[in-house]
């Protein structure tokens, strides 16, 4: 009988030290050394950890592994964006790398599919399959860094920013999200600034309250409507936590946060003649007056079968200017990677086909489910 090996990517620093002490009989500094090899140098072979003694390397090889998602497919956009389909077990998720002059952002998935059924998001077509493990979340960052080129090879950091805006709702996977974020921030991990790690949520108030005081990262909220009636139509989660409940939890989080500097980023997808009228803009401005924020307008990115359209540039411009009349800070997100379906709201692509092929098998095994109303 073969014993399943322990994936060290599933441990943050605290968990790694505990494992080394309890299972390997080793001191904390040895765990720290191994973490540094994994995340600073991208090493996944214990034999290459040259400052680890042979006896410990043999124990690690016998009991442990360093196993990140692998690249099943890579698509390169004309603007430099790269979309990877990354294999996690017998399923795939999508991870997007967005290079700019002053930063390199990685958009990371937290679930296979999504349970929230937002009407304008292509990932919702896939439905929910399962939560990703810690190793599958942080492993996307690890794999992307290897694909782009490690700092020791290129002289620059391969990834400067991480946004949890890929497939899935991060706050419905708190158990695995928090350790993954800890590794992103840890100096022995990727050592990212807390202001450069962003978690986006569609309004899981219980999860946001759980994060408050526990981990400090930048927060973005997917709002997309200025009133409950419209939001419930396009985002069913609003029936569980309405806008006022959501914004109250946002204010609690940013009050305890240094990463957000007192402001939250509000994401608002503009859907042609659905939520982009000037009355909607004025209503949104009034809604957000008591919640310090910057508003990021996202022109809808069409995908096959979607009933929605992108507004005209003139409607986008009028919506932005109306908000600015109320002294809000407003930006319009530049669309990146839309030619490879890597833009906001498009993350599903070929993954949906590969995932559906395993759905029946997963159902037969008793697939993981999330009841949003019960969260």
Swiss-Prot record:
A GO biological process held by the record: rRNA base methylation
GO molecular function: 4 iron, 4 sulfur cluster binding; metal ion binding; rRNA (adenine(2503)-C2-)-methyltransferase activity; rRNA binding; tRNA (adenine(37)-C2)-methyltransferase activity; tRNA binding
Gene source species: Vibrio campbellii (strain ATCC BAA-1116)
Family to which the UniProt record says this protein belongs: Belongs to the radical SAM superfamily. RlmN family.
Residues reported in the UniProt entry to bind [4Fe-4S] cluster: 114, 118, 121
Localisation per UniProt entry: Cytoplasm
Positions annotated to bind S-adenosyl-L-methionine: 168-169, 200, 222-224, 301
Gene designation: rlmN
Catalysed reactions, as listed in the record: adenosine(2503) in 23S rRNA + 2 reduced [2Fe-2S]-[ferredoxin] + 2 S-adenosyl-L-methionine = 2-methyladenosine(2503) in 23S rRNA + 5'-deoxyadenosine + L-methionine + 2 oxidized [2Fe-2S]-[ferredoxin] + S-adenosyl-L-homocysteine; adenosine(37) in tRNA + 2 reduced [2Fe-2S]-[ferredoxin] + 2 S-adenosyl-L-methionine = 2-methyladenosine(37) in tRNA + 5'-deoxyadenosine + L-methionine + 2 oxidized [2Fe-2S]-[ferredoxin] + S-adenosyl-L-homocysteine
Keyword tRNA processing attached: yes
Note: Reaction proceeds by a ping-pong mechanism involving intermediate methylation of a conserved cysteine residue.
Note describing how the cofactor binds: Binds 1 [4Fe-4S] cluster. The cluster is coordinated with 3 cysteines and an exchangeable S-adenosyl-L-methionine.
EC number: 2.1.1.192
Domain Radical SAM core: 100-339
Disulfide bridge partners, by residue number: 107-344
Primary role: Specifically methylates position 2 of adenine 2503 in 23S rRNA and position 2 of adenine 37 in tRNAs. m2A2503 modification seems to play a crucial role in the proofreading step occurring at the peptidyl transferase center and thus would serve to optimize ribosomal fidelity.
Keywords: 4Fe-4S, Cytoplasm, Disulfide bond, Iron, Iron-sulfur, Metal-binding, Methyltransferase, rRNA processing, S-adenosyl-L-methionine, Transferase, tRNA processing
Descriptive protein name: Dual-specificity RNA methyltransferase RlmN
Top-level division of the source organism's lineage: Bacteria
Active site: 94 (proton acceptor), 344 (s-methylcysteine intermediate)
InterPro entries the UniProt entry points to: Aldolase_TIM, Methyltransferase_A, RlmN_N, RNA_MTrfase_RlmN, rRNA_lsu_MTrfase_RlmN/Cfr, rSAM
